[in-house]
Amino acid sequence: MVEATTTRASDSNQHLNHPVCFVGAGPGASDLLTLRAADRLRQADVLLWTDSLVCPQITALAPDACERIRTSTLTLEEVIPLLIDRQRRGAKVVRLHDGDTALYSAINEQICALNDADIPVEVVPGVSAYQAAAAGLSSELTIPGVVQTIVLGRAGGRTGVPRSEEL
C-alpha cells in the first residue's frame, strides 16, 4: 500500500525528476563543448537558445524530435514562463547559453524564478572564450613568478558596470 502511494506521488511530481539544465555552449566550436554539455543536448526534449549567439553545429546535437525555441527576439520575462511550462509538462529542458554559464549569462535571474516555482536546476559550465584564446595561442594564463592574477571584466554598454568595478 505504501509503495502504491509512493508511486502515485512520484507520478504526480514527475516533472521534479528533470531539472531545467543551463548549458554553456563554450566559445563557438562544437568540439569545444564539454562531454556533459553534449550529453544534455542529446537528451533534450526542449532546447531554448539565443540563435544569434550559438552556432548551428551545437544545436544540431539535439534530437530531431526536440522542440527548438529561438530566444534572440524574446525578453527574459518571456523566456522564463517557457522554461517553467515545458519542465512542468515533464520535458527535459535545456537552456543553452553562449560561452560559460558563470560569466555574463543572466542565469541568476532565471534560476531565481525557477527556484520560486519549485523547479530544480542543473548548471553545466562551458569553456570560456578567454580559455579558448589562451589555448589558441598555445599559452597559459598563470605562470609562477610572472603572473598569478586574472581579472575578467567588460566594458559598459547595455548592461552597466558598477562604479566600484570600473577599471
Short names for language-model regions:
Residues 10-12, 37-38, 138-142, 164-167:
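A generic local secondary-structure boundary/capping motif
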Residues 153-167:
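Active-site glycine-rich loop that binds ribose-phosphate moieties when present
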